């Protein structure tokens, strides 16, 4: 690898070449070359603007743009020679451009610094990544709506403290994840707005003396706004931090969902089955069918949390404006985006294929006194204070534990020993269907409300 100072765009100041190890240590091309498409996009817009400003001739602009497009084709064909001694994606592309067209290629960087160039590239890249991720969230939500509609009448136990609490429908449970993902979607849309601001034109830190027209590049690159301060434009990475924060929340939701899927597929629950294509086996235990997809999503969540804390730590001690520290912003950002996108894709493929074991779910809901609250509410409607009803039902549950009977399995005489207000009509209240159907309000678990919520969800997705 060559380290001759003449290979560097900044070599004029230096009297000896960069140490070979330092060149490798400070280079970022191995990971930032994935920005090539956005780097070329930004350069094409910059060249177009320079021609309008009279810095380039139309012929020079056309020559630069045509060769940048050829360079992109070389990269995508795998024939581009990435050089570590050229440090990063920007200088590799610029050097290749100069190799192809000579002195005209050297004019491209007029009025621009790598500081505003890389900030622009990252924003363009992240904007596209957010769009892909939003599409995967929508696809997962579509799968949840389809499964929720199909399972609107399927009854399962709802849990608090992982203990049986009250009956719910499986469809209602699935829609809880739909709601969380809707907020994740909103957070990313909001993050995209702040990402979609153009720093190009900020140059190194103070702007440029050339008669640039930032409005032109802003429009060409599809940015919503132009950064209002050159120091801020090149130095802050709060948009990347905000993305990692939103990604962390989304991964936290997927991790919680993963935990439920892992539990539900276990022999102890047996609530659902996952198709073989989303599972793997054991190298020693022939009977095993392991839920690797949700387990890996649960595990990968920590990577995204780490990206967030890493970026916060990276930025916390930096003075204005740009510092080399910021070279370390890309790998955690790239990894967070890749992890969230792939996790969503895996879930969007897997969720519609979930096979609920309805009878097992129902049997589980019949255990654990899941209709105890319904009995208390029944007594309230008979005119008793809720706290008294709570205690009465507590005694009934204690009796059930001692006798091995659930509330619905007790006779009327057994129930009446706890309150004379209990009548024959109590048994309609104590059924699983009676329990879920009674919660017939917006946000409730009644099958009718589940179907209504599915329709609202479908309308929401159709409006995106």
Curated annotation (Swiss-Prot):
GO terms for biological process: arginine biosynthetic process via ornithine; L-arginine biosynthetic process. It is found in: Cytoplasm. Its EC number is 4.3.2.1. PROSITE patterns: FUMARATE_LYASES. Pfam families: ASL_C2, Lyase_1. Pathway: Amino-acid biosynthesis; L-arginine biosynthesis; L-arginine from L-ornithine and carbamoyl phosphate: step 3/3. Transmembrane segments: none annotated. It catalyses: 2-(N(omega)-L-arginino)succinate = fumarate + L-arginine. Its main location: cytoplasm. The keyword Amino-acid biosynthesis applies. Signal peptide: none annotated. GO terms for molecular function: argininosuccinate lyase activity. It is an enzyme of class 4 (lyase). Belongs to the lyase 1 family. Argininosuccinate lyase subfamily. This is Argininosuccinate lyase. It comes from Stutzerimonas stutzeri (strain A1501) (Pseudomonas stutzeri).
